């Protein structure tokens, strides 16, 4: 029921527990200096779930799928640390977290909390409602050129072209024979 309350997917438990272990050590060092009792892993897990439940609506209820579930969890995790340091919430957020909040990955379904809107303005960050797909360069012609230069066939229905476009490194290794060498090594 703890996972249901905060909304995080169960598949995140492994990485979340690893992240929590490192932060727990830092938080317990801070608590020790203040003469406060250490927190168990169970205590930290409950605190994290509670903080995710606090953060999620404030960042606009992003869908809790990769990468947004990680960003939401990371904001909550950093909040636990910065609150223990006496700095408050939303102090340590990287560009990926801000990108989600600002709309650079698309519009989140809910409203961004006024505290975060004010913090973004204070930091000189700008919200956008531009469709992020319109910012991507159309690279298909570059991949066509590469295939032509290498004498590679496009394949039926351009399937080879699309394979190169979707997995360039793996495709190049396959065509050069490097993938087979790596497999047999």
Listing of model-derived features with the role each one plays in the protein:
Residues 2-185:
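Terminal or standalone catalytic/regulatory effector modules within metabolic enzymes
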């Amino acid at each position: 029921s703890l996972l249901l309350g905060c909304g995080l997917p169960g598949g995140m438990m492994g990485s979340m527990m690893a992240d929590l272990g490192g932060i727990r050590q830092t938080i317990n060092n801070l608590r020790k200096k203040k003469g406060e009792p250490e927190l168990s892993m169970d205590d930290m897990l409950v605190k994290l779930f509670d903080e995710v439940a606090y953060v999620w609506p404030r960042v606009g209820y992003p869908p809790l799928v990769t990468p947004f579930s990680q960003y939401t969890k990371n904001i909550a995790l950093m909040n636990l640390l910065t609150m223990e340091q006496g700095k408050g919430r939303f102090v340590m957020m990287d560009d990926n977290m801000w990108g989600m909040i600002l709309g650079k990955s698309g519009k989140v379904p809910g409203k961004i909390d006024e505290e975060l809107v004010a913090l973004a303005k204070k930091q000189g960050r700008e919200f956008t409602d531009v469709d992020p797909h319109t910012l991507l360069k159309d690279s298909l012609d570059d991949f066509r050129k590469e295939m032509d230069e290498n004498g590679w066939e496009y394949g039926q229905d351009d399937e080879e072209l699309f394979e190169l476009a979707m997995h360039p490194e793996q495709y190049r290794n396959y065509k050069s024979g490097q993938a087979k060498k790596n497999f047999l090594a």
